[in-house]
Amino acid sequence: MNLEDYNEKLKLLKKSVQDIKIRNRNLLKQEAEEKEKGLKPRVYSMHDDEDDSDEKRSSDEQSDMRTNLFQYTVQDFIDWEKRQQRKKKSKLESKSGMRLQHLAKNTYDKELQNLPRPEFKMKAKETQFRINKDSGKVNIKDNKELVQRLSQNLKETAKQRYDSNRKIANDKEHTSLSGSINAKNLQFNKSLDDDHEAEK
């Protein structure tokens, strides 16, 4: 086959594509007209099968879905894909380290709120600050007592959280390894194991 034959085939394919598009539009128009006609109240007999009405409903739903699908543009589809990717990304971030960062920030903010403000009010004259020549930012010296109290409170909170998590982990480990709920249950399980080994 030479180039002219391929060119002819391409023209035929393009023409068939256009014919199919026209046929699809006509079918959609017919379905829409039938649907409008179908909205009029109908008279049903008592002996009509419910299955027939279910089939009609499902065919109507399918035609509605088809017409809705033709109303979306490529740009709508691209936007929808981007939204789906953002949702997946946000789910992954919330499951991983973002949750811990959020917890750390909330803990820090709580500790700052818990610091007593009236004791450490500073007067404008006492405030010492410098302007950084490179960045142009203002550097203010923090009150050492406030910083130490904040660090002490954060350490206490972290220790409490660590102790509670360790206790929970130990409880889980103890019950899962031994398979017993309390000391009596543990003793009973050991006697059963001993009896079972003695029978062998």
Swiss-Prot record:
Alphabetic keyword roster: Coiled coil, mRNA processing, mRNA splicing, Nucleus, Spliceosome
Cystine pairs: none
Organism: Candida glabrata (strain ATCC 2001 / BCRC 20586 / JCM 3761 / NBRC 0622 / NRRL Y-65 / CBS 138)
Signal peptide residue numbers: none
Homology family: Belongs to the SYF2 family.
GO biological process, one term: mRNA splicing, via spliceosome
Official protein name in the record: Pre-mRNA-splicing factor SYF2
Keyword Phosphoprotein: no
